[in-house]
Every structure is written in C-alpha cells, then in structure tokens.
Amino acid sequence: ITLKYMFLRSEEEYILTIKNATCAQHIFKCKRNSTECVQTNAGVVDNDYSFLRFGVWFMLNIVAVQKLTAAVHSSVIVCHDEAVMFLGESGTGKSTHTRLWRENIEGATLLNDDSPFIGVRDGRAVAYGSPWSGKTPCYKNENYPIRAIVRLSQAPHNKMRQLRSLQAIGALLPSLPPAFAFDEKLEDAVMNVLSAVVSKVPVYHLECLPDAAAAQLSHDTIFGV
C-alpha cells in the first residue's frame, strides 16, 4: 500500500490529507501549540486502517515536538531498568541486534521495535513505548531513562565508538520524521529535541556483524562492564 499525503500549514493550523488508491480521504487537523489533534472526516468508510494509524502518528508528532518529545525510527531494548535505543536505515539490522540482546544478555527485554518516542522529563532523557511497533507486536505503555543511543551499520567486524555532539545529532536526525524538514518551525522543534537529548545521553556508532559478540560488545561498552 502506498501512502500519498499532502502536508499543508497555515499560520495557526497544520493539515494532513491522506488519500488511498480508491480515493478514500482522511483529513487530520492540529492547531499550533495545541495538545490535541482531530480527524475532521471521521465518518469516512474505509477498511484500510493503516491510513488512520499513519495520520494519528503524524499529528501526534506535531503535538509532541512542541513538548520536547519526538518519534524515532529505532528499536529499543530495556536492560538494568534503562533503555538503549538502536538506530539505522531500514534493513540495517536493528531488530536483529535487539533480538541478539534478548537472546544473549540476561534481563534484556524489548520496549518497541519501530517507532518509540524520546523526550526530556525532569532533566532526564526518556524513551517511551508506543502503539507503533512495526512488524513486531510490542505495544508497551512504559517509559525508561535512556542509557545510550547507538547508530548501527553493517560491517565485517564489530567495532564501537562514542560520537561527539555534532556527530551525535547527525546520527539521530535521519531517524526522526523526515517531513518535518519542510516546515521551519517543526524542524526547529525537532532540533531542540535532539539537542536536549544529546546533551544528556552518550551516542555511539556500532559497526557490527549480526552475531552475539556484537550484542555483548554494545552491552559491555554502554554499561561499562
């Protein structure tokens, strides 16, 4: 299914219009600085609920970034009561790596496998579960302080290094909602989220194989074992 949408903004209101192949149309609106978004055509008959899920996710992000919170395309593991967030392009191996944690690191569990939220609360960076978890049904209404964020890339070896602040922002930015780059105010809000998180959490780059040794390396580096 191909999602086709147009994102418009007036001075006071964001509008998201989604149309599917049969021209069923969903319209969502959110006022600037509001904490609510609404679907204006809730009576539309359409059995494809992916459009509703996408629209709610998109508009929720508009509300969230104004509160120093944003969705991140990532897979998040919880270990020792803290969250570790793994980023990467689709197909890089995020889900594989977090599965290796669960199989090889005692006490490691999955928080979300596709679109968790990150934010800053009471001076700490926090990862939140969400109803959007990709192909893995992991919908947890839980949150944990973030221990570290890791950008993954495939390699014929396992090697991990910590990134400097500017590199860290560059590692995170591609994993946040890309459409926000076309709206100056939303882009600024996203950068505020990234700056706040990076100032509180170490960000790493892990070049790795899809093996248990990679999971052990990232765990030991992050938790100082």
Question: Where are the regions that the model predicts?
Answer:
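Conserved lysine of the Walker
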Residues: 94
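Hydrophobic positions on the alpha1 helix immediately C-terminal to the Walker A/P-loop
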Residues: 97
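A noncatalytic interaction/capping subdomain that flanks phosphate/NTP-handling catalytic cores
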Residues: 1-90, 100-111, 116-225
